[in-house]
A protein has these predicted regions:
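Short, solvent-exposed turn/loop segments enriched in Gly/Ser/Thr/Pro and often Arg
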Residues: 146-149, 198-202, 389-397, 457-463
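Surface-exposed patches in mature extracellular/periplasmic domains of secreted proteins
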Residues: 193-196, 255-264, 386-390, 453-461
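Serine-hydrolase-like catalytic core of hydrolytic proteins
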Residues: 81-258, 286, 295-319
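Substrate-gating cap/lid region and adjacent catalytic-acid/histidine neighborhood
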Residues: 260, 267-430, 441, 448
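Bacterial Sec-dependent N-terminal signal peptides
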Residues: 1-16, 398
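Non-catalytic accessory segments of hydrolases
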Residues: 12-168, 192, 425-438, 447-458, ...
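Structured segments of extracytoplasmic/periplasmic soluble domains
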Residues: 136, 177, 184, 188, ...
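A structural signal for well-ordered alpha-helical segments within the folded catalytic domains
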Residues: 37, 90-94, 172-175, 179, ...
Length: 503
């Protein structure tokens, strides 16, 4: 009898943490068929509807009984696509998920908080619950936030309601979610002092904003960026510009006040979202005090260890063909010396050259240079380590890419980190190897703020002139800064643009 009782106790203790308590009530997980408890939808803020539309997030309301977090929440309102229709959306969207391997609330595991991409207009947290990482010993959180006009519209009348600033509601949602994590993650077996934020595309840009925002100070200790940074002076939208775009959007909708716009159906707003010009985070003097490149130059940012990666064929999602006219228009926009040099580095004499040059230009301007600028500037003005990575693995499988690819397209990194090849070793042996390496490096970084660990190729901190960039391609090996001559040409041009803006 004693042996049976002991065995029952051990079995009970070995179960995932299927029920716990948060500040608004009790919540119950769903098992994922392995050794994790997955809470698919926990409200971290009140529904941003009615008078709360275009306002900072407010605390979620308590509930009675036990909230069964069995299904992911609906998508935030956004334009319809083939895979998401309006009946799948709701303005009541401020939810997060938690996947935990903890068996008790006392385990104090590191925490990884993911912010999804989607150009600040689209997508959903529910596709990325991160069981692949949680199984390696972290508590994985995925956050939803407001997008499109509902998340980023600024207007002078909204500024009057909020001490002079407006817009950036989606970023305020992310900060509010991180504050919720600080208060509640212990009850999932997580350690609030060991939070790493990570994101892809617009989610990576969000992570960079959080690294720069004084409102996010102390909410995380490390950051991973996958294909996104906010260093470009070409992307700077200030409060006055953003409010002008908001005024134009209101006029297009034939509304005369914020009150009228708050009465509109979210579907009508998102159906016109393409007409909303400023769907980007705003330099509002509050969430983002100054252009982020300026904050980094001055050393005024949250100085935490960072791991920054982009992909070798990012532009494959944008182009499957490029005409002579498209090529000429793109490179004709560059002034004198930069236009001439660009045509050397990005030739366009043949159809194939034009296609690959436009893809490479998209990669280098949109992802490569921002990653380089972030890494080099933080090395110069910060104290925390910087790690740099480059995903070059080509696979038959891709997320969004068009036509022939020469490497990893935009968002392909998600396949490797989510474990898409974990059970396909025979068909995709190299992809499986890369996926396992990336997952372990990422989790090590969350655990120790250093990606290195037993059995992994050594990854040194980034140095511009040395082979310190970890390239993932049929394994992992160190290379010098990829596409270096092109990146330095763009760096020279961006310095010129910044000088014009200052003058």
């Amino acid at each position: 009898m004693m042996v049976c009782g002991l065995m029952t106790l051990v079995a009970t203790e070995a179960q995932p943490l299927m029920r716990t308590h948060v500040e608004t009530g009790d919540v119950e997980a769903t098992p994922d068929g392995t050794d994790l408890a997955v809470y698919k939808a926990i409200p971290y803020a009140a529904a941003p509807v009615g008078d709360l539309r275009w306002k900072a997030p407010q605390p979620a309301k308590p509930w009675e009984g036990v909230l069964k977090a069995e299904d992911v929440a609906k998508w935030p309102p956004q334009p319809e696509k083939s895979y998401v229709k309006y009946d799948m959306m709701s303005e009541d969207c401020l939810y997060l998920s938690v996947a935990t391997p903890a068996k008790s609330v006392d385990e104090a595991l590191p925490v990884m908080v993911f912010i999804h991409g989607g150009a600040f207009r689209t997508e959903h947290y529910g596709g990325d619950l991160w069981q692949s990482l949680a199984r390696r010993g972290v508590v994985a959180v995925s956050v939803e936030y407001r997008a499109g006009a509902l998340g980023f519209m600024a207007h002078a009348d909204l500024a009057k309601e909020a001490d002079g600033h407006s817009g950036n509601y989606g970023i305020l949602d992310q900060i509010f979610a991180l504050q919720w994590v600080q208060r509640n993650i212990r009850n999932f077996g997580g350690d609030p002092s060991k939070v790493t934020i990570f994101g892809e595309s617009a989610g990576a840009m969000s992570c960079h904003i959080l690294c720069a925002s004084p409102l996010a100070k102390g909410l995380f200790r490390a950051c991973i960026s996958q294909s996104g940074a906010m260093m470009s002076p070409l992307n700077v939208v200030n409060q006055m510009q953003a409010q002008m775009y908001g005024w134009m959007f209101m006029n297009q909708l034939k509304k005369s006040s914020i009150e009228e716009m708050r009465q509109m159906d979210a579907k009508e707003l998102t159906g016109n979202d393409a007409n909303f010009q400023a769907c980007v985070p705003i330099v509002d003097g509050y969430v983002i005090p100054e252009p982020i490149c300026d904050l980094y130059e001055k050393g005024n940012y949250n100085d935490v260890p960072v791991l920054i990666m982009y992909n070798s064929d990012e532009g494959a999602v944008d182009f499957d063909s490029v005409s002579v006219e498209q090529y000429a228009q793109q490179f004709g926009q560059l002034p004198g010396q930069w236009g001439d040099s660009a045509k050397v580095y990005y030739p366009g004499n043949t159809e194939e050259e034009r296609l690959y040059s436009m893809r490479d230009l998209t990669r280098d301007v949109g992802f490569g240079w921002p990653a380089y600028a972030w890494a080099t500037m933080q090395k110069k003005t910060g104290k925390s380590p910087v790690y740099s990575a480059y995903l070059a693995q080509k696979s038959d499988t891709t997320v969004y890419a068009k036509g022939n690819r020469r490497g990893a397209a935009h968002a392909d990194d998600m396949m490797y980190l989510k474990g898409a090849f974990d059970d396909k070793a025979e068909q995709y042996p190299q992809e499986k190897k890369v996926g396992e390496l990336m997952q372990q490096y990422w989790v090590n970084f969350a655990k120790t703020m250093n990606p290195n660990g037993e059995g992994l190729p050594h990854w040194p901190v980034y140095e511009e002139e040395k082979a310190t960039v970890m390239q993932f391609n049929n394994g992992a090996s160190l290379v010098e800064t990829p596409n270096q001559k092109r990146i330095r040409l763009i760096d020279d041009f961006m310095k010129y643009v910044r000088s014009l803006r200052r003058n």
